[in-house]
Each structure stands twice: as C-alpha cells, then as structure tokens.
Amino acid sequence: MHEIITLQLGQQSNYLATHFWNTQESYFTYAENEESAIDHDVHWRPGLGADGSETFMPRTVIYDLKGGFGSLKRINALYDIHDDDPAQSSSLWNGQAVVQKAEPIEPSAYQQSLDAGLEPPQLTTESVRYWSDFNRVFYHPRSIVQLNEYDLNSSIAPFERWDSGEELFANLDKEHDIVDRDLRPFAEEADHMQGIQIMTTVDDAWGGFASRYIERLRDEYGKTTIWVWGLQEGFQGVSRDKRLLRLVNKAKSLTEIYKQASLLVPIAIPSSLSPRLRKVLSLDTNSSWHTSALLSAAIESATLPSRLKDATNRDSLGNMTDLLNLHGKQTVANLQMSFSETTEVPRSEEVGDEPKDGLRLDLDLRPADDMGDGRKQQNGYHRTPKIFSQVLASRGERTGDDEEEGDSDEEDDRTRRRGPREAISRKYRTTLSYPLPDSFPHIFRDEKGEELKSNVAMTTSLSTDAALSGRLKSLRSTVTRLIGVEDRETLSNELAEMADEYHEGWSSGSDSGEDD
C-alpha cells in the first residue's frame, strides 16, 4: 500500500475536504462482480467499531475552531457506546457535578435522512450552513480536533492574522506535541506512506498555523512527500484593509511553506469568467459549498493517479513532484482544469506553436497576488506564460479510441521533452469520470446549458511556469511596505529569491519571463 494522510486546517479547507471524501466514498462498489478502479487503501484505514464490526474510515486529521464542526460529533454511531448506568462510570469526584452545555446544533435534513437510511432531500445553498451538513462519511474519533481557543466567525477575536495562527500552533505544540498526538497514530498504521496532503487557507491565521505544522512535519518525516493546497479567498466585497491583511498573510505563508513543502499549489476561484464558462458553470461565489466543490473537483482529479489501480497511469505524489520541480526549487505549481460531458473531450488549447510548449485549459485557478489583479483577471489569465513542466490528468473521455491506439497512445503518455529548453510533460489517462454524488451542487452544465447530474469528463493541469516570477514580484512590492521593519528585509528577500527561480531563462537570470 502507498498511503496518503490528509490534514484539514480550518473551515474553508474542511468544505473542500468534505467534497473530496464524499467523492472517495462514491468510488466504493458493492456488487459482487464490480471492481473499483480506485485503490481505497491509499486514503482509507480499516478498523473496528465499538461493537466489533469492521470499519473503513478516512486517513485524515480535521482541525477547526470552536463551533466549526456544526452538528458533527466526535463520537459517531460506529463508536458510540451508550452507558445506561452513570453510577458505573469511573470518577475521582464524589461531589455534585455541574455541567454546562452549549445548545447543540441541529443536524441538517440531509444528515437526518442519511442517519435514518432514507433518500436525502436535495441540498441548497440555504440548507448548507456548515461543511458537516453535506458530509457523507464517518470519521474516526481521533480525526476530529476542535481548537477551543478561538470561536468560528468571532467578531471579538477573529482568527485572521498570520501571527495568531503561528502563536496558536506554538502553544498547542508545546502542551501536547501535536504531530505526536494527532498525526503519528495514522502514520504508524501505514505500511508504506506515500505522502501527506494538506488543505489549508494561506491568507488568514491558518496560514501561520499550517506553516509551523509543516515545519514540524519536515523535522519528523524528513523525506516524506508533502503536498499543500493553499486556498485563498476572493477579494469581492472585501475592504482595502482586509485585502492588504490577506496579502501579507499570504506572503508569509508562501515564503514559509515554500521552505518545507515538496509542492505548494495556491488556488482560488477566478474573479470573472468568460462568456462560455458562464454558460457551462453555474457557480454561486457567495456559497462555500459551491466554490469548494469546484476546487475539490480539480484537486481530486489532479491527484487521481496517486490512487489508481491501473499500473500504466498510476503514479506517486513524489514522482509527480519530481516531474514538476525541474531544478530543485520550483516547488510552487499552478492548477488548471477543463470539464465537459463524458461524450466529449474537455477543452484545451496549445500554449505555444507546438504541443511541446504545454496546454492551457479553460479555468486557471491561480489566485490574485496584488490589489488590482482580481479586477483585470479573467479565467485566471494574463499573457501566455512560458511553461517549464506540466502534469496532465485526463479522465472520463469515452471516445472509444483508447484501446485501439495501442503503442502510439502509450508513447503519448510517457514523459516527453524534446530539447533542453522545451517544456517537460506527462499525461495520465483513465476512463473513470468524475462522479457527482447527491452531496455535490449542480454547478456543471453542458454546452446547451443543461445540468450534468451523474458524472463529468475532466482534464487538469499542474504546471510550473514563468508567470509566477512576475506575480511574486508584484506581491513583494505590495506587502513589504506593510511589514514591520524587523521582518521587512527578510520577507522581501525571500519573495525575491522565490521569483528568481521562475524567470523564463530559468537559471540564466533573464528577466524576459516577467508577465506583470
């Protein structure tokens, strides 16, 4: 087995991860002669419930603030043992106990139907209050970690500054040794751990928490592949001061995570869409349920090779990292996606004059890196960047040609690079389409504008390109004047050094690749 352990840090990341786990749950097959294309052992752990029954639960640790779990209980039905005689419970206190309880959050109608084994009602943006409202899986009690030091959405003490997250991690780690308490039990269960996948926001306090967590992980698991999905919120309707704070948080997160992670992929919903995308994508950008669904579909598809059974198109997170990181320091990648009906091939276009220069997909998920970027950006694109390396994952294309192409198809899927200055590329393929469980919002449309309700063909791209150099310089010019004198020079230098790794001339020092 090549297990992957997931860490989920914060409310927005848990929305994202809930879609991810619901998708993994949908891959299970129950017919006697039906075999799944997915190796479930990569993300799921076997165990025993309180009654001795076998269980299969995610290899994940979920962190959220007080009030962030909604109606989700730490002890679920598989581990709940009812004690009818409280006198039998062990206690060192013989006096009268006074128990204070907060008003419990009522489970959503969707959750109540799942618990009762009934057909659940269709979810809506109004009925989804928390990520747990559309959750379809059981978690091990060890997976649930509530941080009581901060309340969710508090206006008195908001969890929004990078330094607050850094401080919280330091205090908790000093008291509990977080890695040893929370992650090590899952790591010790793994026969051959493939890597650690982390989902976190990077433009708030969770960025500071994540940065120090990853630093500890690197100390404990020096050679383990660590992938970080760095979520960033949009700027629409956000005050100038909050925008600047988020950019400072992001700059600190990028420089700190860059030092330790094997791969960091910043992601966000584009601020505007092309007319075609507005036709085929029905997205409520004010709904975390909607936006996290789109991002999760891209992430789940991009990492699909890491859990496929098909040896030809299966690959590890470590190998994909090596393909993207050509020179040892290009560890920040960009995520793109295209989707369509399963009877069609998802749209893409060549970046340069030949396919060797890379492919550009419909939707670019790189975040805004300066105050004006979100206003001028459409589908995430400026000018066409020089691509250094690209890893493509294509799923659900039912053209009928795959089995007949034989050797030519196999040759096309191999890692290709024709010359020292050309993009290196690798493409993974599977007929397994992206599933749409009933917990997933109806955001995908066909070219006629009609809902896609069962599954979707999808292509994703992870790439390293020269555009990041200009973006990092733009971020640097915005945030350095906002940082205290004691940290300003260090942060400025670190952003500049990161930008230098993505010049179009690679190690030549050429500035020709700057796009901003």
Language-model features: where?
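Terminal, contiguous helix-loop blocks that mediate binding/assembly
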Residues: 1-201, 205-516
